[in-house]
Amino acid sequence: MKKCFILLLSVCCIISSCGNLSEKEIEETTSTGVVLVQNQSYYEVVLSNGESLYFSGFDEEGDLTGITTDKDSVELVTNYGTGFFISQEGEIATNFHVVSNTVADKEVNKSINKVISALKKVIVAIYNDYNEKLERAQLAYDYANQSPEISYEDFYKVRDIRDAIQKEMEEYAQYYNSLDDIRASDSEIKYHNEVSIAYNNTFVTNTNDFVSCVITKSDQEHDLAIIQLKDKKTPSDKYVFPIDDEDPLETYSWKDEIEKKIKEDKNSKLFMSSFNLGPKLAITKEGIKSQFNNGNISQKTNDRLMYSIPTLPGSSGSPVVNLQGQLVAINFAGLNGTQNFNYGIRVKHLRNLVNK
């Protein structure tokens, strides 16, 4: 009897020393390793004649937005997601779509004709505007030419203005005609972007408060990417998420099996730290703060995990952990029409990317 009691006591001690964590412990431990990811981007169209055009992106109908011929005036599109540290060398895991072009190459290439068409419309509008200016300038010229009250100096000024407008119109007309000679097949659309991160529990007031990163690895098929701080150093006070060699959803140690029977399955509940809606919800008087939510597994496939953790846009790339704080998935998508059933990419694909 005494031996049984001692054995039971020993088992209880083992379980209590290395079992499941409390929700508070999980949040406090993992939240420092979560970062807000910012992606600022624009597109460049290199035409077959060697000239470049720029635009911000695509609207819901697939049309171009913010088209311009001036690189310095192109409006950057800013999107946000979530990431988390996976090494001491400043490596951060997130979703591919958070840090890269989300439009398929074939769809982008189709847009070259749209670019040319949109540019023609812009040129026509500018040409018509100059035509109205020319009509007014011609009236002023005719008046100056016939009026004895106008000095020769003022007359020449009016003439020069009219001639300058005519020259501009001729150049725009030539440019318009030259667009017909541009071959879409020989033109190219390039995606330009800058990726940066902000640390959880820090103050962010503008883009200068973000730390620049580079994209080092990507897996478009599984929507995963690894970015890295340029100095390749993870701050000492940031939590680094371990990536287990074996899937925690499938692998149970003998201690896990005992806890599963006596207390609770380590995978019975999942937790996620994320930046829902980017900085909109994250900004507080104490700095930006991630949101911590939990839910249950609804479905498992070989590649994905569906769970009931509520999310909003901006949570893409968030770490999903179990009751022991083990990384089991990377959040990437929600079901249409609901925010309470979401999908994550199983951690094995991140492990494969890290080892790539």
Regions flagged by a language model, labelled:
Residues M1-C4, G83:
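Positively charged n-region of N-terminal signal peptides that target proteins for export
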Residues F84-F85, P310-N331:
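Catalytic nucleophile loop of clan PA
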Residues S100-I182, V328-K356:
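C-terminal cap/linker of serine protease catalytic domains
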Residues C18-F96, L179-I182, D186-N200, T207-T216, ...:
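N-terminal activation segment of mature serine protease catalytic domains
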Residues C4-I14:
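Sec-dependent N-terminal signal peptides
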Residues N20, G90-A104, A137-A144, I150, ...:
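Conserved active-site neighborhood of the chymotrypsin/trypsin-like protease fold
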Residues D223-Q228, R304-P310:
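Short, solvent-exposed secondary-structure boundary/capping segments
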Residues S22-E23, T78, T205-N208, V214-T216, ...:
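Flexible, gly/ser-rich surface segments that form the specificity/activation loops bordering the active-site cleft
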